[in-house]
Amino acid sequence: MNSTLHRLQREIAFSLDGLNALQTQLQPPSRPHKWTIQQIMEHLLLSYSGTELALNARLAKRAPTRAKPSIPQHLGQYTLIRLGYFPHGRKAPPMVTPAPTAHLLCGEELTAAAAEHLANLDLLCAEAEELFGTTCKFASHAVLGPLNVNQWRKFQLIHGEHHLKQILAIRKAHSLSPIEQPTHQA
């Protein structure tokens, strides 16, 4: 697996380690209207599914998008992908907003679901890299516009880490902190 996506997979596993299905329903105590741990992960899973659809569409056409990034999209790409800053307080687009939880999942189940999506994304990114190279902005993100394969990987990492910080904060607030910090080695 590509080192960027592998790092994300390890960080997800660390963040969810040892949580049972009731613990994944915890929210920030001071902000009970915010998503639960499971809903945060479901948001990420919806994001991965959307990315899979976007990449599959371009791979099926065997042609990159003709879209060009707008000035706001250029700024968003620079801020998020180059600087690694994900803005706080933005409302998620409807297509990646999790529904109310109907089936409780434990941390291990959420980790497995994420690992499956990330493995699929890794295969799609590898295929896109082979077909389009690393610099061609071949597929468009709904907010950031056209991205190249490494930008797609980096987006997933930065977006994921943004939400994993929220999960770790919820765990800490409920005295459920994981034992060790993950290393950022490949």
Predicted regions and their residues:
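Aromatic-glycine hotspot motif
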Residues: 1-186
